[in-house]
């Protein structure tokens, strides 16, 4: 009896050791973020990775590979093996805008990746310094259209979505701006809150806190519906401007030639994660909305539509990086 108990105990130890070794030998999945830690892309990636890892029972590591307008990180994914272990958290810039800004790129945005699934979106917020003397869009336009010299407009950098959005909106609304580029949204928003520039268009993750705290004055959301944490801010559509919805977005992409079963497995896991109330609350807490329910084909169509919209506009506005 004692011998039987001994061997059962020993077998249990061996099985546990084998399971632990198997878990340790699981190769983690990598989500590559093309911007530094702490930004919207990084936060979205980490929130989604945590939930998706639990669903897949596989660790997911978030790696930040910033530089060259997101092209360093994107190129690393384009060159990765299509084995389901490396994915790109792709945003407007590396996935679409750079194609209209740079004549030479280390990867082909249209051929180097396989779209997998949507992740999150954030509407652009139009906001001004608090001592500009306006409290709504109507008052702002009355001031901006007659201002000479033009109002100063901050952006996160030349060719950035914040820059292109601002130039586009100014042209459609009938006012001019003096563009002041910064090296990222954080210093640009800080300059606006400090009264050093007049105006900015920025995604909610980097602009919402200042708007809610009263350091800046939010005028309008560039979306088709209001955002719950800023429910008092009207949309541009409510203010009389149709078809001006502009969002900053993130999608998940795999290297080209990634097998369809791998793509579908990740698609289903991420879409399931995006339905969980805890994730939705965390995503909304940073100023994003889940971009849930997309099939790989729908993700590809979404990117293609964004490309058709923005590339001609970049050429029309004549925006080029320095």
Provide a role label for each language-model segment.
Residues 1-11:
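Bacterial N-terminal signal peptides that target proteins for export
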Residues 18-20:
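N-terminal signal peptide c-region/cleavage motif recognized by signal peptidases
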Residues 79-85, 100-187, 236, 249-282:
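Hinge/capping helix and adjacent helix->loop/strand transition within the periplasmic-binding protein
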Residues 121, 135, 207-275, 305-308, ...:
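C-terminal lobe and pocket-closing loops
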Residues 26-28, 260-322:
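An extracytoplasmic/periplasmic, membrane-proximal ligand-sensing/linker region
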Residues 89-94, 98, 185, 202-207, ...:
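Beta->alpha turn/N-cap motifs
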Residues 23-111, 150-152, 162, 172-199, ...:
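N-terminal (or domain-start) structured segment
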């Amino acid at each position: 009896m004692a011998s039987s108990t001994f061997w059962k105990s020993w077998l249990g130890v061996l099985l546990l050791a084998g399971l632990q070794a198997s878990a340790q030998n699981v190769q983690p999945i990598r989500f590559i973020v093309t911007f530094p830690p702490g930004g919207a892309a990084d936060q979205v990636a980490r929130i989604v990775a945590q939930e998706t890892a639990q669903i897949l029972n596989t660790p997911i590591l978030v790696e930040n590979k910033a530089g060259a307008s997101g092209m360093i990180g994107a190129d690393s994914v384009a060159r990765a093996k299509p084995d389901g272990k490396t994915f790109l958290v792709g945003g407007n810039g590396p996935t679409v805008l750079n194609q209209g800004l740079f004549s030479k790129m280390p990867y082909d945005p249209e051929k180097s990746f396989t779209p997998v699934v949507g992740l999150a979106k954030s509407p652009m917020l139009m906001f001004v310094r608090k001592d500009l003397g306006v409290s709504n869009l109507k008052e702002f336009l009355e001031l901006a259209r007659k201002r000479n010299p033009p109002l100063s407009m901050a952006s996160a950098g030349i060719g950035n979505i914040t820059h292109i959005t601002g130039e586009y909106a100014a042209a459609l609304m009938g006012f001019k701006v003096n563009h002041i580029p910064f090296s990222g949204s954080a210093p640009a928003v800080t300059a606006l809150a400090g009264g050093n520039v007049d105006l900015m268009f920025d995604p909610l993750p980097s602009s919402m806190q200042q708007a809610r705290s009263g350091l800046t004055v939010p005028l309008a959301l560039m979306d088709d519906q209001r955002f719950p944490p800023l429910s008092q801010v009207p949309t541009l559509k409510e203010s009389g401007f149709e078809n001006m919805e502009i969002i900053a977005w993130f999608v998940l992409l795999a290297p080209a030639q990634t097998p369809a079963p791998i793509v579908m497995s990740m698609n289903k896991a991420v879409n399931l994660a995006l339905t969980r109330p805890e994730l939705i609350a965390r995503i909304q807490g940073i100023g994003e909305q889940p971009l849930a329910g997309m099939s790989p084909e729908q993700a590809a169509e979404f990117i293609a539509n964004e490309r058709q919209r923005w590339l001609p506009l970049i050429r029309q506005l004549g925006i080029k990086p320095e």
